[in-house]
Amino acid sequence: MSRIVVLGAGESGAGAAVLAKVKGFDTFVSDMSAIKSKYKEMLDRYDISWEEGQHTEELILNAEEVVKSPGIPNDAPIILKLKKQGTPVISEIEFAGRYTNAKMICITGSNGKTTTTSLIYHIFKSAGLNVGLAGNIGKSLALQVATDQHDYYVIELSSFQLDNMYKF
């Protein structure tokens, strides 16, 4: 069984962890901050190991791949160590994209992302399409892919979410 480590346990990280677990990965989540109770409950429900308030290197550096939440800088010490040893570090969006055949409409840019994303989602939903809303608004893409597959996803992507995307 492959080992996936998820760094950050907010909406993005918790969703990525659930998807990893559902797909059969040995999954571990680490967050330097306190994890909100709703995400702890989600991780516990899926029997996912987690830690908060630290990044225990021996539990992280043995990952075959790491899913990094967008709030963690690429120059964080643990990220630099992972990259130095050659461990792939990817985004939640990149990870989730591997497990869906849905069509994805992604919106990025400086201004108007949320409005544009919401408008497109509303148009699709009003047309009766099976559509999910993800990214900076709505549930994480990974959580939706794990729990309620859609035919379409409308995704708002910040510049931070574009980091660590390679094949999406």
Please place each PLM-identified region on the residue numbering.
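Phosphate-binding loop of NTP-binding sites
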Residues: 58-61, 70-168
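N-terminal leader/targeting and accessory segments in enzymes
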Residues: 1-91, 95
